[in-house]
Structure formats: structure tokens, C-alpha cells
């Protein structure tokens, strides 16, 4: 009887042990099955973007000087069947600051990518200095567009603000009021982006959600300097306090 009990106990122990080993793979499989619908949507989005990339058209024109104006004329754009921009007409002119607002998925990033000619309208036309965007050589207009977001946060701070080493590290640190190191606070890092925008020689500046941790007095001072620069400044933000410094506000939900 004792031997039978030992066998039964050993069998039960092994049975429970192997069931426990199966638990994690089964849970992982279930999780992966639940993610299939969202993965499929992501895959469709990637394929749509690849298709968009392949349809870009370029010409031979060169950009002479700064970008003075940008016009979108009855632009339509969407991903597959999802229309993001419908009959969108906008005018951007140097010397003005434009606030771009709207919830996630409303088309803010799409609009920026269209202006940068990373996407191309499905209908309608985009003009740079009254010349069709697709008449310019590839990457020609990008020479005058400075996009500043938080996609560089893992880089060396000095490389972020001055990748071409035009200024000394000492000058930049004196201007900022703090030392450039790898332990910057969120506020210091975002102010670094603002400083980069102020130092840029390009004629179009796009600021994408870089204000949430910056002191309001510093933001006010930066926008005062932006006004003096006579450039096209496009500001993407959810901060209502920042919008008060813009000359006009573009609501993506109204387009």
C-alpha cells in the first residue's frame, strides 16, 4: 500500500508540475491570439504607408532661398478607406505662428508629413512658394524645414541641439543656463528643443509637443523671439496656454 501511495503521490506531483509548465505558453498563446486583430490593423497601416511612399513624385526644380509661403489647395488624403483630410485648404506665410490642435488620429502628423513631402495628396495640390511641391527635386524643400519633436531623447544632448557643431558647447550651456549631460530633467530636455528651434537657420520650424514641462516664462520669451525671426512656425500642442502665443489656430476637427 505504501508503495502505491508513493507512486500515486509522485504521479500527482509530476502531473501538476507539467501542467504548471504549460500554463505560461497557453497564456502567451491566448495573448497573441487576442492581439491578432490589432496586429492586422497595424500591418494594413504599414502596407498603406509603403504604398504611399512608392507613389511620391518629384521634379527638377530647386528651391531658391527661403520658404515664404505654403499652400494646401483642396487636399484629400487617407489610409486605405479612412479619409483623414477632406478638401483641406490652408495658407501658411512667413512671419506668422500657427497653432495646430486636434485629438490623436485627427490628422496632425499627416498634415506635417504632407508639407514635408513624405506623403503625397491623393487629390489636390500643395504649393511651396507658389510652385507645386512635386515639381521640386527630392528632399529639396526639406532643406528649409526644421522638425523638432521628442524623437531624439536618447541622443547626446549636445548632438541634439547642434548636430553640425556650429557653436561651442560652452556657449550653448551659457545660453541654456545648465550643463549638457545625460541626466537632464524633462523640462530641461524640452527647453533644449526650444533652444534648437531658436538657433535654426531654416525658414520653416515645426514644433511637435515639446512644451508640457517647460516654464511658461521661457515659452513666452521663446515665442517673442520666434515673432522676430519672420519664419513660418507651426506648433503642435495640447497646451492651451501655448496657443495664446500663436497668431492663428487650426483645428483639425474643422478641416
PLM region descriptions:
Residues 21-49:
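Cytosolic ends of transmembrane helices, especially the final helix of ABC transmembrane type-1 domains
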Residues 180, 209-210, 214-215:
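Walker B catalytic motif
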Residues 50-99, 132:
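Primarily ABC-family ATPase nucleotide-binding module
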Residues 116:
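Helix-to-loop junction immediately C-terminal to a conserved catalytic motif
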Residues 99, 190-197:
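ABC ATPase nucleotide-binding domain "signature" region
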Residues 124-132, 141:
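Conserved ABC transporter NBD signature motif
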Residues 199-203:
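A short, proline-enriched helix->beta-strand linker immediately N-terminal to the Walker B motif
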Amino acid at each position: 500500500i505504501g508503495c502505491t501511495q508513493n507512486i500515486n503521490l509522485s504521479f500527482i506531483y509530476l502531473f501538476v508540475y507539467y501542467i504548471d509548465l504549460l500554463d505560461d505558453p497557453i497564456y502567451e498563446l491566448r495573448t497573441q491570439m487576442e492581439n491578432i486583430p490589432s496586429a492586422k490593423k497595424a500591418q494594413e497601416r504599414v502596407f498603406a504607408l509603403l504604398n504611399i511612399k512608392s507613389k511620391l513624385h518629384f521634379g527638377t526644380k530647386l528651391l531658391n532661398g527661403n520658404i515664404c509661403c505654403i499652400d494646401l489647395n483642396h487636399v484629400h488624403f487617407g489610409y486605405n478607406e479612412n479619409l483623414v483630410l477632406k478638401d483641406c485648404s490652408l495658407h501658411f506665410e512667413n512671419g506668422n505662428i500657427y497653432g495646430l490642435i486636434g485629438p490623436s488620429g485627427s490628422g496632425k502628423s499627416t498634415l506635417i508629413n504632407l508639407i514635408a513631402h513624405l506623403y503625397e495628396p491623393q487629390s489636390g495640390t500643395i504649393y511651396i512658394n507658389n510652385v507645386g511641391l512635386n515639381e521640386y527635386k527630392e528632399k529639396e524643400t526639406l532643406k528649409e524645414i526644421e522638425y523638432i519633436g521628442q524623437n531624439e531623447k536618447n541622443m547626446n544632448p549636445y548632438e541634439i541641439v547642434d548636430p553640425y557643431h556650429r557653436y561651442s558647447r560652452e556657449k550653448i550651456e551659457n545660453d541654456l543656463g545648465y550643463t549638457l549631460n545625460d541626466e537632464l530633467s524633462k523640462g530641461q530636455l524640452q527647453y533644449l528643443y526650444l533652444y534648437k528651434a531658436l538657433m535654426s537657420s531654416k525658414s520653416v520650424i515645426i514644433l511637435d509637443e515639446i512644451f508640457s514641462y517647460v516654464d511658461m516664462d521661457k515659452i513666452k520669451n521663446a515665442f517673442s523671439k520666434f515673432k522676430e525671426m519672420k519664419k513660418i512656425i507651426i506648433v503642435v500642442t495640447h497646451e492651451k496656454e501655448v496657443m495664446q502665443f500663436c497668431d492663428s489656430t487650426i483645428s483639425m476637427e474643422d478641416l
